């Protein structure tokens, strides 16, 4: 899929996380237990993680950040699709002077 610029579907997330061509894992399952497991496995394989499953960060964020640092990778968060976050983004954009055409 990487070579051809296409999409790869699999049910074996461990194989995907351990693949040598994967640099970053974006975890967005919405399942905090699975998300923590996915992040820890990614760190074990030297992969950075962008955590979209905010419940996992609320549950184990400091531990995940520590494990990422120990593995020499990055643990980062991403805004999800929660309405309050969208409102914050709209406020930020307007404050910066950007016209908001849809939200």
Where are the regions a protein language model picked out?
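Structural detector of well-ordered beta-strand residues that form the stable sheet scaffold
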Residues: 10, 50-51, 76, 101
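Rossmann-fold NAD(P)-binding glycine/threonine-rich loop
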Residues: 29, 33-45, 52-81, 86-92
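Active-site-lining helix/loop region of Rossmann-like oxidoreductase modules
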Residues: 91-103
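N-terminal glycine-/serine-/threonine-rich beta1-alpha1-beta2 phosphate-ribose binding loop
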Residues: 1-45
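A short helix-to-beta-strand connector/capping loop
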Residues: 2-8, 71-73, 98
